[in-house]
Amino acid sequence: GYFLFRPRN
């Protein structure tokens, strides 16, 4: 979802 905060999401 939020690659800015969660690289795997």
UniProtKB/Swiss-Prot annotation:
UniProt key word Phosphoprotein: no
Disulfide bridge map: none
Subcellular compartments: Secreted
Pfam families: NMU
This protein's UniProt keywords: Amidation, Hormone, Secreted
Main localization category: secreted
Similarity remark: Belongs to the NmU family.
Reported function: Stimulates uterine smooth muscle contraction and causes selective vasoconstriction.
Protein's name according to its UniProt entry: Neuromedin-U-9
Species this protein is from: Cavia porcellus
